[in-house]
Amino acid sequence: MILEHVLVLSAYLFSIGIYGLITSRNMVRALMCLELLLNSVNLNFVTFSDFFDSRQLKGDIFSIFIIAIAAAEATIGLAIVSSIYRNRKSIRINQSNLLNK
């Protein structure tokens, strides 16, 4: 695949993730957009690693590390969201003012 096509796809995914983070009012949707951002960065790492030096696996290993961190982040984030929902009965970002109570 051509490098420019993959970079355009990654930029498109990144911009969708940024747009989703800015406009999202739901915490679960915001977590999904954050995962989309991380996956677009992983796509860039793997693409540049393969394009510049396909014998070294630095980009691939770094992508696997980011995937592991993202999985832990998603697990902790969903646990926090479920706890907030249990206490507040809402997962909307603008309704959960956690510093007041």
Curated annotation (Swiss-Prot):
Keyword Thylakoid listed? The answer is: yes
What Gene Ontology biological process does one annotation of this record name? photosynthesis, light reaction
Keywords, A to Z, come to: Chloroplast, Membrane, NAD, NADP, Plastid, Plastoquinone, Quinone, Thylakoid, Translocase, Transmembrane, Transmembrane helix, Transport
Identify one Pfam family in the record.
Oxidored_q2
GO MF, one annotated term: quinone binding
Cite the EC number: 7.1.1.-
Q: What class of enzyme is it?
A: translocase
**Subcellular localization, as worded in the UniProt entry:** Plastid, Chloroplast thylakoid membrane
What parts of the sequence cross the membrane? 2-22, 30-52, 61-81
Q: Which GO terms describe its cellular component?
A: chloroplast thylakoid membrane; NADH dehydrogenase complex
Give the bilayer topology.
Multi-pass membrane protein
> What domain of life does the native source organism fall in?
Eukaryota
Give the protein's function. NDH shuttles electrons from NAD(P)H:plastoquinone, via FMN and iron-sulfur (Fe-S) centers, to quinones in the photosynthetic chain and possibly in a chloroplast respiratory chain. The immediate electron acceptor for the enzyme in this species is believed to be plastoquinone. Couples the redox reaction to proton translocation, and thus conserves the redox energy in a proton gradient.
- Family membership noted in the UniProt record: Belongs to the complex I subunit 4L family.
Spell out the subunit comment: NDH is composed of at least 16 different subunits, 5 of which are encoded in the nucleus.
Protein name per Swiss-Prot or TrEMBL:
NAD(P)H-quinone oxidoreductase subunit 4L, chloroplastic
* Protein source organism: Oenothera glazioviana (Large-flowered evening primrose)
- Species lineage: Eukaryota, Viridiplantae, Streptophyta, Embryophyta, Tracheophyta
| Gene that encodes the chain | ndhE
